[in-house]
């Protein structure tokens, strides 16, 4: 309260106090692609991160076997094509996150749009990986968009989730060069390697509290 009164209120700032002996609790959301999930779990099991992973959440059964390999509970809520049960699903997900005391969420190629309610519950605490060098090629199939446009590099971007699709504060980016010999399929393969690296870097920085967000941008402390 003293710090809040002395500094935060005066400068219209927000601050958080964390203790090193309390591990952040990270929930992972996935759909059908396994490359980012495997990379995150391998780093977790190798002890690279001071973090707990109490649950993996999905809208498909496809990756349950991965969760079982790492002995992490896997929860599935299927979403109808017309999204008529989307609100109900997110309520159930939010109850799980609260029960498991989740402090931040990683979207490891989770192919669903996060609602405003969940974003408000976890402001600047939902990390997404987008398979393009934002702000270029937002939305679906960015590698195919890049190939059709004839670009010479492709990239991946990890960012915090906001209400505007693929437009949140950027945490980490990287690129790789491509040539006329590449196909959409080869771009996807090259992109998957980038996605794993970029997402893991972003998660590392978040866990280490090295990110300051300001006006939809980030300041990264080394």
Please tell me what each predicted stretch does.
Residues 35-46:
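Histidine-anchored nucleotide/phosphate-binding helix
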Residues 27-35:
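Short, glycine-rich nucleotide/cofactor-binding loops
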Residues 51-62:
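Short internal beta-strands
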Residues 59-60, 84-88, 100-222:
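Donor/substrate-binding cores of folate-linked one-carbon enzymes
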Residues 68, 72-100:
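Adenosine-nucleotide cofactor-binding segment
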Residues 44-53, 71:
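A short alpha->loop->secondary-structure connector
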Residues 1-22:
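A conserved regulatory-domain signal marking ACT and ACT-like small-molecule sensing domains
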Residues 23-26, 125:
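Residues that mark the start of a beta-strand
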């Amino acid at each position: 309260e003293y710090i809040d009164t002395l500094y935060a209120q005066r400068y219209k700032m927000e601050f958080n106090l964390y203790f090193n002996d309390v591990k952040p609790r990270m929930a992972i959301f996935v759909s059908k692609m396994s490359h980012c999930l495997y990379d995150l779990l391998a780093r977790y099991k190798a002890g690279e991160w001071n973090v707990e992973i109490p649950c993996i959440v999905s809208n498909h059964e496809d990756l349950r076997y991965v969760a079982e390999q790492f002995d992490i509970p896997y929860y599935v809520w299927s979403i109808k094509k017309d999204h008529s049960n989307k609100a109900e699903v997110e309520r159930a997900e939010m109850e799980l996150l609260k029960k498991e005391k989740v402090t931040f969420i990683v979207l490891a190629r989770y192919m669903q749009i996060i609602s405003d309610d969940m974003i408000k519950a976890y402001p600047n605490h939902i990390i997404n990986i987008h398979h393009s060098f934002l702000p270029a090629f937002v939305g679906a199939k960015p590698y195919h968009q890049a190939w059709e446009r004839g670009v010479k590099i492709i990239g991946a971007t990890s960012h915090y989730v906001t209400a505007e699709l693929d437009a949140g504060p950027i945490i980490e980016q990287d690129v790789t060069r491509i040539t006329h010999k590449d196909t959409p399929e080869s771009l996807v393969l090259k992109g998957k390697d980038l996605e794993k690296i970029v997402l893991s870097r972003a998660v590392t920085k978040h866990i280490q509290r090295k990110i300051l967000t300001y006006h939809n941008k980030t300041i990264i402390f080394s």
